[in-house]
A protein has these predicted regions:
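A conserved beta-strand-loop-helix scaffold within acyl/acetyltransferase catalytic domains
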Residues: 11-114, 123, 127-133, 267-272, ...
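Long, compositionally biased intrinsically disordered regions
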Residues: 186-318
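Acyl-donor binding region in acyl/amide transferases
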Residues: 98-173, 178
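Short low-complexity, flexible loop/linker segments enriched in glycine and/or proline
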Residues: 153-155, 183-187
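Extended amphipathic alpha-helical segments with heptad-repeat/coiled-coil character used for oligomerization
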Residues: 175-185, 198
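Long amphipathic alpha-helical coiled-coil/heptad-repeat bundle
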Residues: 1-8
Length: 318
């Protein structure tokens, strides 16, 4: 049994110093490894090669973090890909979609390595995202443990996450999982029926590392807030809303660079007077970093951007 929180809090090493040539070679390795599996992920396909990082996690295990090129980045979340190696051999890949201190995490362990150290390896991925990006809330979509994924159901993947401390977000499913877990611990021969495992896929599972820092919003919810505002105030004309936001930004801060997400967020702030001038300026500065700086810097600054979170809370209460 792995003590997840103990593992996640064990201090990580600084990234390995890589030359420009070594970074290029590492990115080639990532692409080749996925190609051999007939797989592809956006961070690997559209990698910012000079931003790639490699971390030694101990016991011959290392993880490469790969970032998207500036023109491929998402509007709100930061999609950070990874590939893990055991003694230099690729054993796992996936990615994390980070927004604030929350992260939707996905993992794919190569078939030959799915037994034995699978849980420990995934914990190392969580450890890296927790410490390198200050993530305190991880969640896993139901597909990872069986929704539309027969292999996930057959393998009982739900219990893989459960043993690491993840719990169903939906209260009724959480109660059901506790009942099943008790049966498993009482009778070692007991196996959860497939129809119960299917019920578990009604919603995501999550891991809280800081109970006092539960995320209030996720990217789809923010998109819905913005869409509802556009529908109400601009008769569903997104282009007009964006242009209005640009005008306000240009008028108040003389910003000429284009960022549609910032334009729409600023529009919400400006129309509702929910932010002070300083908070608006901080919001603008953070989102201008999104395409003009490293994605790691954007993640860090967005976490500290009180105006962004205040704006969402104000809109969410309406």
């Amino acid at each position: 049994q792995i003590n997840t929180k103990w593992v996640l809090n064990k201090k990580i090493n600084l990234p390995v110093k890589l030359t420009t040539e070594q970074k290029g070679q590492l990115c080639d390795t990532l692409k080749t490894s996925l190609a051999l599996l007939s797989r592809e992920t956006d961070p690997v396909t559209f990698a910012d090669e000079q931003a790639v990082q490699l971390f030694n996690m101990g016991r011959g295990f290392s993880i490469a973090l790969v970032y998207l090129k500036k023109d491929r980045r998402l509007s709100l979340e930061s999609y950070i890909g990874y590939m893990a190696f055991k003694n230099g051999i690729p054993v796992s890949y996936g990615g994390g979609w980070i927004l604030g201190t929350s992260c939707k995490i996905g993992v794919n362990i190569y078939p030959a390595f799915r037994k034995g150290e699978s849980a420990w390896m995934f914990c190392q991925v969580l450890r890296l995202y927790h410490q390198n990006f200050k993530v305190s809330y991880f969640y896993v979509n139901p597909y990872q443990f069986g929704k539309g994924n027969p292999e996930g159901l057959k393998s009982g993947a739900f219990w893989f996450y459960y043993r690491l401390g993840f719990r169903p977000v939906q209260p009724d499913i959480n109660v059901l999982s506790k009942t099943e877990w008790k049966k498993i611990n009482t009778d070692k021969k007991y196996r959860t029926p497939v129809n119960i495992l299917k019920k578990f896929t009604a919603g995501p599972v999550s891991l809280h590392l800081n109970k006092n820092n539960t995320p209030a919003f996720f990217a789809p919810e923010i998109s819905t807030l913005i869409s509802n505002y556009i529908n109400k105030h601009f008769n569903s004309n997104r282009k007009a809303a964006i242009q209005n936001g640009y005008y306000n930004l240009t008028t108040q801060f003389q910003l000429t660079a284009k960022n549609e997400t910032l334009s729409l967020l600023y529009l919400l702030a400006d129309k509702n007077n929910s932010l002070s001038l300083k908070e608006k300026k901080d919001l603008a500065n953070v989102f201008m970093l999104q395409y003009n700086n490293s994605e790691a810097a954007f993640i860090k600054n967005l976490q500290k951007c009180s105006g962004f979170w205040k704006l969402l809370n104000t809109q969410g209460q309406k």
